[in-house]
Every structure is written in structure tokens, then in C-alpha cells.
Amino acid sequence: MVLFSYIVTYNRPKLCPNAIWDADGTTVFNQSLIGYHARGIFVDSNNTLYAVAQDHSEILTLFQNSTIQVLSKRVQLANYTGIIVNIDGEIYLENGTESGRIVKWAKNTNNSMSVAHFPGHCYGLFIDHNNSLYCSMNEKDAVVKMSLNDKTSKIVNVTGTYTDGSGQNQFSGPWGIFVDNNFTLYVADSGNNRIQCFQLGENIGTTIAGNGTPNNLQLKYPTGVVLDADNNLFIADKNNSRIIRVIRDDYQCVVGCDSNSSSTSDKLNNAYALSFDSHGNLFAADEYNHRIQKFTLATNSCGNPN
């Protein structure tokens, strides 16, 4: 039973089946800004891009008017923390001083407060419509959650056995996560080279991408997953250095389609994470090229993005 309904801030653009993106990306954060490790990113409904500059202990933002701002300096950040922002502009990520401790920053402040303490590092974070905070514990092989509505809320195991494995109720290093409007959970099960789907209340998953599904799709250590408005999957296929779109019973490559890593503008070198703005433009954390790339939705595909 749904007791609360919160407005979420992530974008799920409506995309045509024949949508394509410009082959050449634009660097929005380079190495001097993002540091050596380009990992956690998030674009909110105001089209503000948030990025974790872990090496600089900073959180970066890029506003729609192209203004860059450093939100917080001298922040202790966990190496692989995800990042999520709620409707009030509060930023959630993992503090680097203590495993599993999630902190939030109120909008326009440098002050943080602890909101959760999970039993392992959170490589992926997500907030659903019920204002529940999810954590994918890569090293514990489980996904857990807790309500942000009640300070006394307990941590609940969503799925995973806390043991590395390839069963449909197991993970081998879960990474990026996404929860849709029906509270269906999608998990990038990196070590098993697949994307797993879990219906509400179920701890037995279904493989919906990877290991031959669909149409012989082979993923290699996927670490990011998001959905568009029609529940089509977009996957950061990390070690194949590409972004994949799964639509119906087939898949398409969006970026890095020859799977050869490079530093040219049309390539990625370890596609770590991705996020959309409201226009359908795609942002990718290009980890080993030490940059965040923007790939614009082509004007001859699904209308005229701004």
C-alpha cells in the first residue's frame, strides 16, 4: 500500500524508437574539474548536472545556462559513491569517513547531516516515489532500503543473499540501480554481466539484459542503468566502453558502438554511469578519459531538443 507519493527529480524522456544521438560528445567537465575518476553523475528535472569530483573532494554542478559551480569543498567522499538529488535540491551521497554512512546537503549550503547508515558501501543510490532511499552494496552483494520519512526507520533487505553468486536471487557486485513508478527495481549486476529486474515484493529477479538477452546481447561489467518514459533500458556497459539501449526484444548501441575505448569525442573509455536531461540529451561519466560527456539528441530523431 502506497502511503506517500513524492515528486522525483530524475528525467525519463519520451524517446522515439528511431532516436539517435550525435556521435560526437561535448566535454562538460574535464579532468581539471572532475579529477582522475569520473564516476557519479545525476541530472535533475531542472536540467542541472551534478557530478562527484572525488579526487578534489568536491561536488560540481552545471546549470542549464552553462554556469559551473562547486557546491561543496573539502567533502569526504567514498570512492565509488552514487549521487541522487531530491525535489528540494538536497544532495545524497556516501561519506568517505565511514562505510555506508549516507549524508545529505541542503540546497545552497555546505552543511551536511547524516541520514542513514547502511551495512556496506553504496555504489548506487536511488530515491523512489515513497521517499525510500535504496543502496546497492557492491561488496555485500545485496540491495537494501530505508524510509526517509521516519528517523527511526529500519533498514530493509530488498534482494540479494549477501553471498556472491549467479542465481536469480544473487548478485556478483551490484552497482547502479533504478526504481520505476511501480517500484520495480532494476540492478546493474556487474560481475554477472547482466541487468536484473525485481518486481515489488519479490527477491527473485529476471535477467532482462546481458548473457544473450535480448537478441544475444553480451554485456561486460555494466555499472549504470536508467529508464526512459516507455521503460526502455539504457545501460552503461562499462568494460565495453559503450552505452546500450534495450527496446522491446532487441538492443541498439548509442555511444561507443565499436566497443574500442578511445579519448576521441565519439568514444568512451569505461562508461561508468549515465543520466538524461529533460530534452533527451545523454550525459555519460567517461571514467578513464577523466571527463563527463554530453551527447545531444539528434534534431532529426525525436523533435528539436534545446
Model features per residue range: what roles?
Residues 50-53, 92-95, 134-136, 186-188, ...:
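Residue position within the beta-strands of beta-propeller blades
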Residues 26-32, 68-74, 110-116, 156-167, ...:
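A short beta-strand motif characteristic of beta-propeller blades
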Residues 3-24:
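Blade/loop signatures of beta-propeller domains
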Residues 34-46, 76-91, 118-133, 164-184, ...:
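Beta-rich, blade/repeat-based domains predominating
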Residues 63-67, 105-110, 147-151, 199-203, ...:
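Short loop/turn segments that connect beta-strands within beta-propeller blades
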Residues 50-74:
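Beta-propeller domains
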Residues 269-306:
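Blade-level signature of beta-propeller repeat domains, shared across WD40, Kelch, NHL, RCC1
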Residues 57-60, 99-103, 141-144, 193-195, ...:
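Structural signal for beta-propeller blades
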